[in-house]
Amino acid sequence: MRKIISMAAAALILASGSALAGDAAQGQSLYNAKGCVGCHGMNGKSNNEQLYPSINGKGAGFVSAAIAAFKSGERSNPMMGPMAQTVTAAEAADIDAYLAGQ
């Protein structure tokens, strides 16, 4: 019985981890389609750091956490607050996967 419970727990952990892992190719498409590129620049490299920070290469989870913080109101910004509301958790994970590799 313990073996079955252990195997079930391991399967749940693996399944939840893969659900959080984003698709970089889909993330690139979303990054462009949702307009992120307009402020944060090609591949997440901003042309105006004072207004729009670069968000490339920050590591896995950075962008997803930032989007979640803007959605919840933990972080506020008149531009990012409304933009974050249009991004699902799955889309954020995809965008995150794309930008983490840039």
PLM feature spans:
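Acidic/polar helix N-cap motif
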Residues: D23, G59, T88-E91
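Classic N-terminal secretory signal peptides
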Residues: M1-L20
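Axial heme c-ligation environment in periplasmic c-type cytochrome domains
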Residues: N48-S54, A68-Q102
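The canonical Cys-X-X-Cys-His
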Residues: G35-M42, I95
